[in-house]
Amino acid sequence: MAYDGFVNYTISKELSPCIIGGKIDSIFEPNNNEIIIGIYNNSSKYALDIVTSSNNYRVCLTQNKKVNPTFAPNFCMVLRKHLLNTRITNLYTLSLERIMIIEFEGHSKSENIGKKKIIIELMGKHSNIILVDSCDVIIDALKHFNNDENSYRSIISGSKYTLPLSSKHDFINLQDEKIFYEDCLNYSKEYNTEKLTDILSNLYTGFSKTLISCLLEKIYIEDFLSENNTSQAMQWSFRP
């Protein structure tokens, strides 16, 4: 299954009971695409694995033991300074975007840090882990980008964090079946395609083509645009 916005949202809901309220007791960076955060919560220990590899990005709990470098990389040291001994107060996604946010509060070993957040962007080769303060000012990031490398935002220490640009619609806030169909119809005409897998994956956040194909197969409708098909897809997606 592709790691799309729906998967990211579901994983956040599964992780929350395990790690919200937990105390950060270790942070490691076994390689330049991965951070592992040790969490103690409800008399249990958890290892939160955050991977930003372009072809296998994910957030999950792990029991795998990784070999860590003798000397911790700079970003790992920054995370330890700001997050060790704090507690996780919240974990959530931004709608169905592939962005997960973890909030921390408390005292680190060196100072009263107040509130901090890590923003996990799971977007292929652009995947990143960004540490920000309570005002969303970037403290540090696993990967840095300046205006020369990225025309619309900088990921460097001291700059204000801004969300990645997205032209897609928010599927969660969609309420009207007629508007849903009209949006799909307009896209179909503009890009000359009637395949729902193409239309939904390019028009709305959260959908991968793999997920759409599974959905269509589950509700026994074919992969083409019609008002009946979009109505059934929307009703199934929002059912309790």
Residue map of PLM features:
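Intrinsically disordered, low-complexity boundary segments flanking structured domains
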Residues: 10-15, 36, 74-78
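Glycine-centered C-terminal helix-capping/turn motifs at helix ends
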Residues: 20-21, 85
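Residue-level recognition of beta-strand termini and adjacent short loop/turns
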Residues: 31-33, 95-96
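Short Lys/Arg-enriched alpha/beta "domain-start" segment
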Residues: 2-15, 66
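Amphipathic, interaction-prone secondary-structure segments
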Residues: 34-41
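Phosphate/anion-contacting hairpin/loop surfaces
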Residues: 3, 43-240
